[in-house]
């Protein structure tokens, strides 16, 4: 597991973009696993700013709310259109359909899409309780795409995007932890003190379904980009022989960003 230490959201965005750019430029027909929320916003802005050639790129999104129309500004369909799909010409884009009449069938359909489009790089944020995607504590590590009931803590964390609490959806479709782990490479981004406990569990905690992010301890190719606040509860042991810690000056001055993905 590689840990890339940054000071600002702008640095996180630039380093994250370079990792994505490397995949897009070196793979013939790359597939990117996309996340939503505030964590990847800067990275998506860099993709727009740099006019990344996405004409060969297929995207698959992690999740979508259930019963939230695609045109709703808080749906992840809307989010992706606003952030990327209306700005860059992708080969193909997929987002789970939370409006499907048969949600179980939609989960199976989406698993088929993932099987046909193996993910080269999966972007992840991390929840304060360690969730990845909408996979809450207690989710089996081998879970496929599934329907989940959102915990109260997750709904409260997402309340800032909605006008009132009752507008926050109670359920979502999410790629399962087993689905996420099939990605060839994972890029997890974390900023701020609110993520510190979850990041500590990810890097130093016990491998346990009680903290979904700890599954990444067993993934062969994970890069974590985090600031000092997000790393504030971690011991210096994170710089042991299993992990590499770089600073922004290391990363942007040479080719080491690409090397962390190998």
From Swiss-Prot:
Active-site residues annotated for this sequence: 63 (proton acceptor), 129 (for ring-opening step), 131 (proton acceptor), 136 (for ring-opening step)
GO cellular component, one term: cytoplasm
TM region positions: none
GO molecular function: glucosamine-6-phosphate deaminase activity; identical protein binding
Record-linked InterPro entries: Glc/Gal-6P_isomerase, Glucosamine6P_isomerase, Glucosamine6P_isomerase_CS, NagB/RpiA_transferase-like
Pathway where it operates: Amino-sugar metabolism; N-acetylneuraminate degradation; D-fructose 6-phosphate from N-acetylneuraminate: step 5/5
PROSITE patterns: GLC_GALNAC_ISOMERASE
GO terms for biological process, alphabetical: carbohydrate metabolic process; glucosamine catabolic process; N-acetylglucosamine catabolic process; N-acetylneuraminate catabolic process
Any Pfam family the entry gives: Glucosamine_iso
Keywords: Carbohydrate metabolism, Hydrolase
EC code: 3.5.99.6
Catalysis: reaction(s): alpha-D-glucosamine 6-phosphate + H2O = beta-D-fructose 6-phosphate + NH4(+)
Catalytic EC class: hydrolase
Family statement drawn from the similarity comment of this UniProt entry: Belongs to the glucosamine/galactosamine-6-phosphate isomerase family. NagB subfamily.
Function according to Swiss-Prot or TrEMBL: Catalyzes the reversible isomerization-deamination of glucosamine 6-phosphate (GlcN6P) to form fructose 6-phosphate (Fru6P) and ammonium ion.
PANTHER family named among the record's database cross-references: GLUCOSAMINE-6-PHOSPHATE ISOMERASE
Protein name as catalogued: Glucosamine-6-phosphate deaminase
Gene name for this UniProt entry: nagB
């Amino acid at each position: 597991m590689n840990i890339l230490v940054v000071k600002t959201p702008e640095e996180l965005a630039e380093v994250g973009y370079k990792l994505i750019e490397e995949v897009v430029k070196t793979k013939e027909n790359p597939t990117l696993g996309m996340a939503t929320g505030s964590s990847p916003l800067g990275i998506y802005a860099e993709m727009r700013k740099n006019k990344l050639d996405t004409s060969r790129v297929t995207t698959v999104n992690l999740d979508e709310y259930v019963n939230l129309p695609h045109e709703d500004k808080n749906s992840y369909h809307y989010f992706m259109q606003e952030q990327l799909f209306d700005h860059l010409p992708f080969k193909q884009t997929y987002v789970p359909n939370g409006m499907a009449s048969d949600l179980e069938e939609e989960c199976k359909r989406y698993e088929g899409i993932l099987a046909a489009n193996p993910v080269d790089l999966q972007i992840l944020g991390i929840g304060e309780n360690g969730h990845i995607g909408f996979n809450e504590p207690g989710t089996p590590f081998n879970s496929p795409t599934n329907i989940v009931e959102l915990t109260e803590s997750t709904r409260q964390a997402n309340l800032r995007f909605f006008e009132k609490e009752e507008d926050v959806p109670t359920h979502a479709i999410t790629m399962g932890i087993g689905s996420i782990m099939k990605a060839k490479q994972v890029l997890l981004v974390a900023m701020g003190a609110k993520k510190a406990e979850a990041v500590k569990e990810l890097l130093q905690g016990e491998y346990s379904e009680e903290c979904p992010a700890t599954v990444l301890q067993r993934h062969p190719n994970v890069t974590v980009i985090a600031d000092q606040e997000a790393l504030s509860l971690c011991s210096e042991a994170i710089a042991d022989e299993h992990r590499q810690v770089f600073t922004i000056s290391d990363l942007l001055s040479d080719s080491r960003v690409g090397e962390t993905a190998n």
